[in-house]
Curated annotation (Swiss-Prot):
Its cofactor is ATP. This is Pup deamidase/depupylase. Belongs to the Pup ligase/Pup deamidase family. Pup deamidase subfamily. ATP is required for the deamidation and depupylation reactions but is not hydrolyzed during the reactions. It comes from Rhodococcus erythropolis (Arthrobacter picolinophilus). The lineage of its organism: Bacteria, Bacillati, Actinomycetota, Actinomycetes, Mycobacteriales. InterPro entries: Pup_deamidase (IPR022366), Pup_ligase/deamidase (IPR004347). GO terms for biological process: modification-dependent protein catabolic process; proteasomal protein catabolic process; protein pupylation. It catalyses: [prokaryotic ubiquitin-like protein]-C-terminal-L-glutamine + H2O = [prokaryotic ubiquitin-like protein]-C-terminal-L-glutamate + NH4(+).
Length: 499
């Protein structure tokens, strides 16, 4: 299987020494501190190229109007605008009041795990460097999606899809899937409702913030299916499915199955497999009901009158993917591995969700919380449980509860720590992220700006030179590796590419 995938995570941020600190300011400090520690001075830090971005274009065929206002800030060090492009092809920047790591494009779900996990190491270093600045507040970063005060911030997935596939088919095929996949990839949350005031535990941190079936916006009226039509690639050939319903995962199996199963269901949809019989009667309500039931026994209503659990819905998707793959002449090892792990996890969850406490986030978190509740005699309404929930997602290797579970062998990993550390500084080799990252590594001082689909060189002439990268599977090591090795300067590279 080969589908371009990208994961972007807004991290929670706090300053224990200065609780009233402005999060936009502290997020800016984190990004700038990481840049300084990486030895990238302000004058040489590549800017993000916003010219080709169109975040208000809707896949349903219209643009959401943007109210007139001041021009966007262009000073990359201004508060709230800090940005850097990393040599691994990722983007590290301030998005609203959060530091965000947007991983480079990958073509394999396991690589999505590796470069997403690399983002955790980047953020841990960013907080550490920012906190070491004399007089600066101590920062802590969390890979989660809620602040405990009613606000949610996103972990977004991106999948490159064929423009030929009707968007209505994507909505039909994915809505029941997204509603039910949280049984596997929910990260777990103490509290019910957006503010978390109602006592209890639920599967997903994001579900209570889903309010409509389909929508363009990502900060209010969030939809099960997001309609942003901004492919960051050849728009005549591709669309980018922008997924906002997912949680920030720490468990590698959760991330692997989250992106891997979604990619396989997209294969079904693009092949024209009929999934209309799985339509939900009340999709938004189903999202909430499935999340609020850690027993996994409650059912949701389908449009045809059937009642199914989230597990049962996932089982149907698994069966249809398996049947689809059985028709393929050449078996794909990655697809087979995802299907095998998908089936294994569903079997374990059906028998006892706690059997997944060493591989999935929400059961791991629930086991920690239940142990703490039993030792301390706490009800689910106890405020201390919210602190345990938060500490699970702390990115510090010695403090975060998830990381401590890994250290003592209580959470299984799918990748090695060396693979993750290599990915902090190196790009994937089989997507255009390789070209972007290697250009930054070799010729960073000569690059004025970059984006997902272009690299802009400043060679000292009257005009900047934009090299488009509209094909995500070009610009790979196989495609441009020898060329990059054969040139000694950015000018020579640009000359080779343009003549």
């Amino acid at each position: 299987m080969q589908r371009i995938i990208g994961v972007e995570v807004e991290y929670g941020i706090s300053s224990p020494s200065e609780p009233s600190a402005n999060p936009i300011l502290t997020s800016t400090q984190a990004v700038l501190a990481y840049a300084a520690a990486a030895g990238v001075p302000r004058a040489k830090r590549t800017r993000w190229d916003y010219e080709v971005e169109s975040p208000l274009r809707d896949a349903r065929g219209f643009d959401l109007g943007r109210m007139s206002g001041p021009a966007p800030v262009i000073d990359a060090d201004e508060i709230g605008a800090a940005n850097m492009i990393l040599t691994n092809g990722a983007r590290l920047y301030v998005d609203h009041a959060h530091p965000e790591y947007s991983a480079p494009e990958v073509a394999d779900p396991l690589d999505a795990v590796i470069w997403d996990k690399a983002g955790e190491r980047v953020m841990e270093a960013a907080a550490r460097h920012a906190s070491s600045v004399p007089g600066a507040p101590r920062l802590q970063l969390y890979k989660n999606n809620v602040d405990g005060k009613g606000a949610s911030y996103g972990t977004h997935e991106n999948y490159l899809c064929s423009r030929d596939t009707p968007f209505a088919s994507i909505v039909t095929g994915l809505t029941p899937f997204f509603a039910s996949r949280q049984v596997i990839c929910g990260s777990g949350r103490v509290g019910l409702g957006q503010s978390g005031d109602e006592a209890g535990f639920q599967l997903s941190q994001r579900s209570d913030y889903i309010e409509v079936e389909v929508g363009l916006e990502t900060t209010l009226k969030r939809g099960i299916i997001n309609t942003r039509d901004e492919p960051h690639a050849d728009a005549d050939k591709y669309r980018r499915l922008h997924v906002i319903i997912g949680d920030a995962n720490l468990a590698e199996m959760s991330t692997y199955l989250k992106v891997g199963t979604t990619a396989l269901v997209l294969d079904l949809i693009e092949a024209g497999v009929d999934l209309t019989d799985l339509q939900l009667a009340r999709p938004v309500t189903a999202v909430h009901h499935i999340s609020h039931d850690p027993t996994l026994r409650k059912t949701v209503a389908l449009a045809d009158g059937r009642e199914l659990t989230g597990l049962a819905l996932q089982r149907i998707y698994l069966e249809r993917v398996s049947k689809f793959l059985d028709r393929e002449a050449d078996r794909d090892p990655r697809a087979d591995d995802i299907v095998a792990k998908w089936a294994m996890v569903l079997d374990l969850l059906e028998r006892d969700p706690m059997e997944c406490a060493n591989i999935l986030d929400w059961p791991a978190k629930l086991r920690l919380l239940e142990g703490f509740r039993n030792r301390e005699g706490l009800a689910w309404s106890a405020p201390r449980l919210h602190l345990v929930d938060l500490q699970y997602s702390d990115v510090r290797l010695d403090k975060g509860l998830y990381n401590r579970l890994v250290a003592r062998g209580s959470m299984e990993r799918l990748v090695t720590e060396q693979q993750v550390l290599d990915a902090v500084t190196n790009p994937p080799t089989d997507t255009r992220a390789y070209f972007r990252g290697e250009c930054l590594r070799r010729f960073g001082a000569d690059i004025a700006a970059a984006s997902w689909d272009s690299v802009i060189f400043d060679l000292g002439g009257e005009s900047l030179i934009r090299i488009p990268t509209l094909e995500p599977l070009r610009g790979t090591k196989a495609h441009v590796g020898a060329l990059l090795d054969s040139v000694d300067s950015a000018a020579e590279l640009v000359d080779q590419l343009t003549h």
